[in-house]
């Protein structure tokens, strides 16, 4: 009776079999392996282990995840992930700031919910978020050059953008680099397989939302935020980083590396307060 009532209620919905809407949350095919692994109690956790010697399997899985994110983005190093794509974008802004550079340029073609999170972070950290108009759906080079200033820290682009259009990231990041402004590219991981990598486009940090890789819609989130950067920015990355080493007998071992950046050691001076991950 309950199922019949629910089906009757659901019949009022309009179902689209082929739909290109979603605004960042899309219905993708999910391999059965995903559900099989996520049902394993010893594997399903949002926490990166503190005792590396007891958790080699979990650490290896995160290390392999980091490796694949680096391959996808073309970057040198990845962290163990953050809460979602919007958080990843906001954390990337914090990586670029310094006392003399606290202005962030963001085109209006970026997802409005990402912009909301960025503004929240910016207000807390004393950063100025400048939104650039995109009358034709993409950011134009002339608009960017006019907005660049001495206190600009970074430029954030989304690829493809909120309107589904492809930004001319290479040209825009090159223009920003002339003023020593860092480039951040927020990418769709599925589209990233077809487009030039974030590093090839001229970005120094790549972030994105991992939901298209095989996560249920889950009423809009939270999902998975991935982050990767060039090696020069490595010590500013938030969250955990798993590294590969060898033990005293020469066997391969996985460890949590560069922990001096993290909040359990540096407290309020840490690069971020994030210490959990969504990589699984």
Predicted regions and their residues:
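Short loop-beta-helix segment that forms the pyridoxal 5′-phosphate
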Residues: 51-54, 71-90
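Conserved PLP-anchoring active-site segment centered on the Schiff-base-forming lysine
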Residues: 99-113
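Buried hydrophobic positions in well-ordered alpha/beta secondary-structure cores of metabolic enzymes
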Residues: 1, 69, 104, 118-119, ...
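Gly-rich Lys/Arg/Thr-decorated short loops/hinges at beta-loop-alpha junctions or inter-strand turns
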Residues: 40-52, 70-74, 100-101, 122-129, ...
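Conserved active-site segment immediately N-terminal to the catalytic lysine
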Residues: 199-215
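N-terminal entrance/gating region of PLP-dependent enzymes' catalytic architecture
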Residues: 1-64
């Amino acid at each position: 009776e309950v199922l019949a009532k629910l089906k009757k209620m659901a019949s009022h919905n309009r179902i689209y079999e082929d739909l290109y809407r979603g605004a960042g949350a899309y219905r993708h095919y999910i391999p059965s392996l995903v559900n099989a692994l996520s049902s394993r109690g010893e594997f399903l956790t949002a926490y990166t282990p503190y005792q590396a010697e007891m958790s080699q399997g979990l650490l290896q899985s995160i290390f392999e995840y980091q490796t694949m994110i680096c391959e996808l983005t073309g970057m040198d190093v990845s962290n163990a992930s953050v809460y979602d794509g919007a958080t990843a974008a906001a954390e990337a802004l914090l990586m670029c700031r310094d006392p003399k550079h606290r202005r962030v340029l963001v085109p209006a073609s970026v997802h409005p919910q990402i912009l909301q999170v960025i503004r929240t972070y910016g207000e807390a950290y004393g950063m100025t978020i400048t939104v650039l108009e995109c009358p034709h759906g993409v950011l134009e080079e002339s608009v960017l050059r006019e907005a660049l200033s001495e206190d600009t820290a970074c430029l954030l682009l989304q690829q493809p953008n909120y309107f589904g259009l492809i930004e001319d990231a290479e040209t825009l990041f090159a223009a920003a680099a002339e003023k020593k402004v860092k480039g951040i590219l927020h990418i769709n991981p599925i589209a990233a397989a077809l487009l030039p990598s974030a590093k090839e486009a001229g970005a120094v940090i790549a972030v994105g939302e991992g939901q298209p890789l095989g996560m249920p819609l889950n009423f809009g989130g939270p999902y998975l935020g991935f982050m990767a950067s060039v090696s020069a920015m490595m010590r500013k990355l938030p969250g955990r980083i798993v590294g590969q080493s060898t033990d005293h007998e020469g066997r391969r071992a996985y460890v949590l590396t560069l922990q001096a950046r993290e909040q359990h050691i540096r407290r309020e001076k840490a690069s971020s307060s994030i210490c959990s991950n969504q990589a699984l």
